[in-house]
Amino acid sequence: MFMTSKKMAAAVLAITVAMSLSACSNWSKRDRNTAIGAGAGALGGAVLTDGSTLGTLGGAAVGGVIGHQVGK
């Protein structure tokens, strides 16, 4: 049974995200909210702009700012 390249990339991404988030256990709540907002914004920007790099970066920036301001 062979994995397609998309499935392999998705698995590697999931493992990388899980390991990255486990390294953030000592972050403050605001830092975590900023990182989560940036990730969600990047995903939203990529979806809305059909994978455009500029859209992804813009979404990450806006999401990070929103995540930082939540719960202030």
UniProtKB/Swiss-Prot annotation:
**Lineage top rank: taxon:** Bacteria
Q: Name one GO cellular component term.
A: outer membrane
Subcellular localization(s) per the UniProt record:
Cell membrane
Q: Which residues form the signal peptide?
A: 1-23
What triggers or suppresses the expression of this protein?
By elevated osmotic pressure in the growth medium.
Transmembrane spans = none
Task: Please name every pair of cysteines joined by a disulfide bond in this record.
Answer: none
Q: Where is the lipid attached (S-diacylglycerol cysteine)?
A: C24
User: Lipidation annotated as N-palmitoyl cysteine: which positions?
Assistant: C24
* PROSITE patterns cross-referenced by the UniProt entry: PROKAR_LIPOPROTEIN
Q: Which UniProt keywords apply?
A: Cell membrane, Lipoprotein, Membrane, Palmitate, Signal
Provide the topology term for how it sits in the membrane. Answer: Lipid-anchor
What is the designated name of this protein? Osmotically-inducible lipoprotein B
Q: Which organism is it from?
A: Salmonella typhimurium (strain LT2 / SGSC1412 / ATCC 700720)
